[in-house]
Amino acid sequence: ILCAGQEETYDFVEKLLIEVCELFPYKYFHMGGDEAIKGHGIWEKECPVCQAKMKELGIKKGKELQVYFNNRVNEILKKLGKTSIEWNDGIGDNTDADIVGHYWLLRSPSWIKAENNKKQCYRNKN
């Protein structure tokens, strides 16, 4: 899990994405993010930098910091001409509207929220 509270993290991610996007010239870029829920507790309880960022942003939960992180990465990807996709686990109320949610749980709470105003794709288990 990267430290979502440090600006250097976003500098690193941008350099990494520039290289990766040169290798894969596709329109869409899947950010993943479903395993990031394991880092929420670290951000909330163990990382003073993330705790300070959460306080600065007025957020209380690691999930909200993940949404902030994903939105920041989305801005980088947009500059590179990509459309971001992420697993539904990382979708929240403040997720940028142009991020495509990739849903694999039928009618999960995040799916229902997304139906209101977010782009989405669905993975059929069959």
Kindly label every feature range from the protein language model:
Residues 1-98, 105-107, 111-112:
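Active-site neighborhood of glycoside hydrolase catalytic domains
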Residues 109-126:
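Aromatic-lined glycan-binding groove of carbohydrate-active enzymes
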